[in-house]
UniProtKB/Swiss-Prot annotation:
Signal peptide start and end residues: 1-34
Name used for this protein in its record: Pregnancy-specific beta-1-glycoprotein 5
Any one Gene Ontology BP term: heterophilic cell-cell adhesion via plasma membrane cell adhesion molecules
Sites carrying sugar chains: N104, N111, N175, N210
Subcellular location: Secreted
Database matches in InterPro entries: CEA_cell_adhesion (IPR050831), Ig-like_dom (IPR007110), Ig-like_dom_sf (IPR036179), Ig-like_fold (IPR013783), Ig_sub (IPR003599), Ig_sub2 (IPR003598), Ig_V-set (IPR013106)
Organism, scientific name: Homo sapiens (Human)
Transmembrane feature ranges: none
């Protein structure tokens, strides 16, 4: 396509007075080899942007052309016209101040609004044919820019395998199809969903610590889609069965005993140590310097998660040998 011609500026005569998609227009009854066509540039333009109705294959020997809003060629729908002789622009009642017509018949609409959607009529008048002319129609199909969806959730801190979760994708519209994503993978639509809008609510009967997300929802219409910001769950779980380290259970008197306990838990669990059922101390680590035989017995690490209300424990038996020389039989002199 060639460059646009500059809009005429020698004389102006004024009477009293989203996203858009465009289809190509073929003019009717035009007795030339190359048909006049119109295309929108860009084919999709966001509300508030500019769109150019670019005319191709404009015939020679023209007297002028007129643009109308809609398919009725009357004064009320008259936007603007261009008279070749004198390079005159004439503006009608439908002119908003945002339209610019060029000498090649192309029409620029600036700061596009929803009201700009619909049909446009271009009437081309050839010299010697001022009354009949050639008329064609060009239609904008309104394409609204999708809003950015967002997720609401009934519980952002669910308990593992216990709480039912309900994700809702907003906003609600019968015109949207809703799609859910987990860790970048689309989730299958439940067979119970009969209408696309019903999929805007995602129900999870239970959730595990491996299903924290991120979760995203996407809304789609016939022209495109828009995805929400990711949402990550804080799944409460545990405590799992704890482990005690090191695992060996035999000590000599006078050695130092160091034990640590760990259990998977969110939030972190509280730790308690008991020896033979008697509370010893709290915390993950237990240390007893210079252990003696009185420290023999059953060592238990108990863990508790106040958020989940769960508890768990692990026990081990510790043996302590007597000091060297204690508890041994005296040596006998050989006969």
């Amino acid at each position: 396509m060639g460059p646009l011609s500059a809009p005429p500026c020698t004389q102006h005569i004024t009477w009293k007075g989203l996203l858009l998609t465009a289809s190509l227009l073929n003019f009717w009854n035009l007795p030339i080899t190359a048909q006049v066509t119109i295309e929108a540039l860009p084919p999709k333009v966001s509300e508030g942007k500019d769109v150019l109705l670019l005319v191709h294959n404009l015939p020679q020997n023209l007297a002028g052309y007129i643009w109308y809003k809609g398919q009725l060629m009357d004064l009320y729908h008259y936007i603007t016209s261009y008279v070749v002789d004198g390079q005159i622009n004439i503006y009608g009642p439908a002119y908003t101040g945002r339209e610019t017509v060029y000498s090649n018949a192309s029409l620029l609409i600036q700061n596009v609004t929803r009201e700009d959607a619909g049909s446009y009529t271009l009437h081309i008048i050839k010299r010697g044919d001022r009354t009949r002319g050639v008329t064609g129609y060009f239609t904008f199909n309104l394409y609204l820019k999708l809003p950015k969806p967002y997720i609401t959730i009934n519980n952002s801190k669910p308990r593992e395998n216990k709480d039912v979760l309900a994700f809702t994708c907003e906003p609600k519209s019968e015109n949207y199809t809703y799609i859910w994503w987990l860790n970048g993978q689309s989730l299958p639509v439940s067979p119970r969903v009969k209408r696309p809008i019903e999929n805007r609510i995602l129900i999870l009967p239970s959730v595990t610590r491996n299903e924290t997300g991120p979760y995203e929802c996407e809304i789609r219409d016939r022209d495109g889609g828009m995805r929400s910001d990711p949402v990550t769950l804080n799944v409460l779980y545990g405590p799992d069965l704890p482990s005690i380290y090191p695992s060996f259970t035999y000590y000599r008197s006078g050695e130092n005993l160091y034990l640590s306990c760990f259990a998977e838990s969110n939030p972190p669990a509280e730790y308690f140590w008991t020896i033979n059922g008697k509370f010893q101390q709290s915390g993950q680590k237990l240390s007893i310097p210079q252990i003696t035989t009185k420290h023999r017995g059953l060592y238990t690490c108990s863990v508790r998660n106040s958020a989940t209300g769960k508890e768990s424990s692990k026990s081990m038996t510790v043996e302590v040998s007597a000091p060297s020389g204690i508890g041994r039989l005296p040596l006998l002199n050989p006969i």
